[in-house]
Amino acid sequence: MLYWLNELSDGGDVFNLFRYITFRAGGAFFTALIFGFIFGQPLINALRRKYKDGQPIREVGPAHETKAGTPTMGGLLILAALSLATLLWARLDNPYVWLVLGVTWCFGLIGFADDWAKVSRNSSAGVSGKVRLAIGFVVAFGAALIAAWVHPEELSNQLAMPVFKDVLLNMGWMYVPFVMIVIVGSANAVNLTDGLDGLAIMPVMIAAGTLGVIAYAVGRVDFTDYLDVHYVPGTGELLIFTAGLIGGGLGFLWYNAPPAAVFMGDTGSLALGGALGAIAVCTKHEIVLAIVGGLFVAEAVSVIVQVLYFKATGKRVFLMAPIHHHFEKKGWAEPQVVIRFWIISLILALIGLATLKLR
């Protein structure tokens, strides 16, 4: 919205700054951060009044018993902060901005319904997993069709291969189901990761920051020529979305830091995971998402392996899944698990960024 202030510029005044994506990304970051700081505590108070029992806690160990009564749905704070920041600072005539916002809010609503079902029944059983997956795939199907439509014709239905120069794999009709798997898989992988105080939000912010840099790079023809990557005009505006996500995420982390005063719930985890998947699709960096979000992949794979192996043999591979609970069972303190997983996320993000140059 504020982008249009640049039309008031004569070329040498403050209004000219609104032309620049980097300036507006900074504005989005601070807008979301300040919003989170201001409205975080009022939201927590409102959630405590509305849902006195808080989120039902899975019985993992004695350390988790103290979390009973902690309010959930804190993802609403992140969603509101990043949406306000994006609507204020991004170009609203950009289809990628609306695509990512739409996916984020649709998955946020799926998560909200699940959170509401849990707290209203005071049960860890929310909306059926099959129902959530079905709705998620419908949303992702719509996103895939829109992405194929808004991408340049030479990139539509193409899968970019990292490291290799200008290598695109034409997926044809398989592109749509592939995108559906990327978005739904990303949403649910982040959801599985959100099991400890602060565990999910920092890796999400790291991944978002990395994808934001990639979106900015592939949205500039000079950068793509230098890096030998495909050019996707318009994706640079997604840097503003990711900046708002990071600002809102930090505002949320202020209250989610151990011991957490609020959980993001499925409202936040599904929304943020869906957002990461949508950004990867828009920028044609779906494979890089698997690297940058490798922690989320590991969490999801640990659950799949645990379930399949148990059904086949009656035995477990891990002491408990997702894998962060396995390390808790091994004797790691919760802060150890969280911070070590943050470090892993940062390393994976650097590897993901390196794929831009390693060609």
UniProtKB/Swiss-Prot annotation:
Its main location: membrane. It catalyses: UDP-N-acetyl-alpha-D-muramoyl-L-alanyl-gamma-D-glutamyl-meso-2,6-diaminopimeloyl-D-alanyl-D-alanine + di-trans,octa-cis-undecaprenyl phosphate = di-trans,octa-cis-undecaprenyl diphospho-N-acetyl-alpha-D-muramoyl-L-alanyl-D-glutamyl-meso-2,6-diaminopimeloyl-D-alanyl-D-alanine + UMP. GO terms for biological process: cell division; cell wall organization; peptidoglycan biosynthetic process; regulation of cell shape. GO terms for molecular function: metal ion binding; phospho-N-acetylmuramoyl-pentapeptide-transferase activity; UDP-N-acetylmuramoyl-L-alanyl-D-glutamyl-meso-2,6-diaminopimelyl-D-alanyl-D-alanine:undecaprenyl-phosphate transferase activity. Its cofactor is Mg(2+). Pfam families: Glycos_transf_4, MraY_sig1. Pathway: Cell wall biogenesis; peptidoglycan biosynthesis. It is found in: Cell inner membrane. Catalyzes the initial step of the lipid cycle reactions in the biosynthesis of the cell wall peptidoglycan: transfers peptidoglycan precursor phospho-MurNAc-pentapeptide from UDP-MurNAc-pentapeptide onto the lipid carrier undecaprenyl phosphate, yielding undecaprenyl-pyrophosphoryl-MurNAc-pentapeptide, known as lipid I. PANTHER family: PHOSPHO-N-ACETYLMURAMOYL-PENTAPEPTIDE-TRANSFERASE (PTHR22926), PHOSPHO-N-ACETYLMURAMOYL-PENTAPEPTIDE-TRANSFERASE HOMOLOG (PTHR22926:SF5). This is Phospho-N-acetylmuramoyl-pentapeptide-transferase.
